[in-house]
Every structure is written in structure tokens, then in C-alpha cells.
Amino acid sequence: MLQKTSHFMRQANLINGEWVQADSGQTIDVNNPATGLKIGTVPKAGKAETRRAIEAAGEAFKSWRKTTALERSKLLRKLHDAMMDNQDVLAELLTIEQGKSLFESKGEIGSAAAYILWFAEEGRRTYGDIVPSPWGDRRILVTKEPVGVIAAITPWNFPSSMLARKLGPALAAGCTAVVKPATQTPYSGLAWGALAEEVGFPKGVVNILTGAAGEIGDEICANPLVSKITFTGSTEVGKLLIQKSSVTVKKVSMELGGNAPFIVFDDADIDRAVTGAITAKYRNSGQTCVCTNRFLVQAGVYDKFVERLAAASNALKVGSGLEEGVQQGPLIDEKAVEKVEELIADATSKGGKVVVGGKRHALGGSFFQPTVIADATPKMRFMKEEIFGPVAPVFKFETEEQAIALANDTEFGLACYFYTGDLGRAFRVMEGLKYGMVGVNEGLITTPEAPFGGVKESGLGKEGGHQGIEDYLDTKYVCIGGLGL
């Protein structure tokens, strides 16, 4: 590991401007998924440490909320610049703890920085309103104010960019934050604390702690000082957080599970569709909430698409993310590999055909072969369950109506993709799909300028776009009377 990378690898929690260990002295091991070897530890904090972090954020909020939008924007721009200045070392740290390729890690750091820059600008545009009054002697104002202390819980698959989507709008709006990164990838989260310190954020504005998820989550949900929870993760955990936080009626933003369909119509550009499919399926080894879970291909091009997708999948280079040219790293852990194996076994027992892959990779550990399964049917678990691995099941359909029905046959509604050369069909299908995000002839659609988020059981709220900062603001109505007008 590079010396500078070690500077950002903080094996302590940041609470009120101090780097501290857990009260109990207990730690959690952090392993490199590519090697299985321990790379360090982080504190195993609990309720008491979480409470102190929340109190520190609450105290810091008193002054932070009074800073101007311009002052906050300047600090966020410095944070953006610091991230880009250290892009290579932050990417290396991310790859070491998460496993994805350095190419993807650099892209994630760049994306995270882009979100910070976007919200540095959006924070200056949280406009209020002057409403025409129905009374001649009164005036009506509508203002926007920061909600207060927010708690952000982030996942292991994109440990830097997911935090950027939450910290960026929160800090821009004038909120303070308590952050809990995933225990599998804590260093990318803790690195934000080091960066925030270095660019001059006041103590207590950003607090980051690792530890027992249940204890930290319970304190966040129950503590009345926390005004909002923002979470990216499983639908199961999201529902639990909503339920527990309802006692104190907190605002919540939830970016939860997905079951993304990728539809290919007969009139599609097949080469373009395959290129998009590789991106939409295999980014981060299939471990993304918006990655394709089900390929739905029209009968007329089914065989051609399967053949080309299989060839492209088989050509992907698998290996340690630190190696040059690697496109597929390991899965996050053994449990993830076992889940993929279960889903493949279920598919083959129900008539599915493994075209390429289907097994653990010769590299061992949690490496898995990019896999394409033909003759997939709705009876297979793929239809309802999120794979979170490098497996591409391909279903066949006959009509446009059937494709839309199959795509919508899920409780999830995060992202979806489809390829067609017919403009009229593009609008019909786009309007018929019950998803928060739709890629038309594109397999990679995420950008800070657009609102990211789902419908149905895929979540609540939006991250990115001008909508992204609204969840961190309260709207206040002010009626001014006695003006003697």
C-alpha cells in the first residue's frame, strides 16, 4: 500500500473533531476480498459513542446553520478539489477494501467529487418564495431551512460515491452529519473525515463512526436530535429503519433494492445493446443496485443476443482490482458467492442453460466467472430476487406488451433499460415501465445532474439533480402582519 494511501486509512472514528477508539476497545477486522487477508481494523462503536456523535453534530449545527450558502459552497469546492488531488490514492484504498478494479475505483472517486461540486452549486440556489397575499396589510414569505442533524448509513458496494450523494446536499443545505459506513468498506468512509478536516470543516459538522450496526441504528432512530435518516442498502433493512424511526417521526430518504430489467427489442441495434448490457450487468462485478437483474429479449433476436452477450462476458478479464486491465474483481465475501451459486443451481434445475461461466473462478476465494444463462423463465428465483453478482439470465418474450408486463412484475422499481430503434415504441415503453429511472439505448445513466431514486419498494426520495437537496430542507411559511400598508 502506498504511503499516502495509509494517510487516509484511518483506523479510528471521528467524533467532534477527535479521532477516537470504541469505549470498549473492541475492533472489527477489515479484509481485502481479493486475498481474504486482513488489512486493518476499525472501532466497534455502540450506542454511547453514537449518542456523543449525535450530540456533537447537534452542537455544531447551531453555528453551521448560520454560515452563508456561499461559505458552505467554498468549503465544498475545496473538498471536491482535495478528492481530485488524491483521486489515485483514494481509489487504491477503495480497491483494497472493496475489490473493484482501479479503473472503476477512480471512476467512483471522480463521481463522488462531481456530486460534491454539484451540491456546492445547488446549495446557493435553495430559493424561497414571495407569495401574493390575499390581504392588503400582510405579506407571505416561504423560506427553506436546513432540517438539522442528519444520519447517513452507506453501503459497501459504492462506499465513496454513496456517501457523497448524502453528505453533499446535507452540508450544502446547512445540516450537520453523523455517518455510519459499511463495516466491510469502512476506510473509504473514514477517509471523508480526514478530507473534511484538511479542507477546514468545523469540528462536529462531520462525524463518522463504525461499529455494531444494530446499536448504532437503534440510537440513530430513537434519538430526537436526529431530524433525518438517509440510507442506501437492502429493502429489508430500509423498512426496519422506517419503522423504528417513525417513533420520532423523522424524515427519511431510502435508496433500496432493485430488480432491473434490460429489454432488447427486435428493432434494436444489437451491438449497441450488448455493449450497454456489459456495462449494466458487470459493473462492480454485478454488485450494484441498478445493475441488470433480468435480460428480456424479443424472440427474433434472442439467439443472436445471447451469443454475442456470452462472447463479450467470456472476454472479461477477472482478477485482483489492483492488476492492470482487470475488469472484474472478486465478490465482496463468501456469502455473496454462495448466493450466486444457489441462484444458478435453481435456474439449471428449472431448465436454464449455462452458456458461459457458472462456476467459481480458478483464482479461488470469492472470484466468480461472468455467467450467462439462457432459457430463463419466470419460475426461477432470478425473476424476484436481486442477484448482486456477475450472472446474466436471459428471458425470451414475443410482444411489447409482454415485455412491459414481465419488466413490471416485481415489487421493486429502481432502474430499467431498454433498446429499440422505434421512437414511438421508446415513448410507449418508457411510459409503461414503473421505475424511477429509465435508460433508453443506454446502459449507464447515473449522473449528478439527474435525480437518482426509485418507486415502489425501491425507496423514497431522490439523490442528485435539483431535487436532491430538497430532502435536507424544511419549508417554512411566514405571514407578516401589522405593516400599516
Regions found by a protein language model. Name each.
Residues 84, 128-272, 397:
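Rossmann-like NAD(P) dinucleotide-binding subdomain of oxidoreductase/dehydrogenase enzymes
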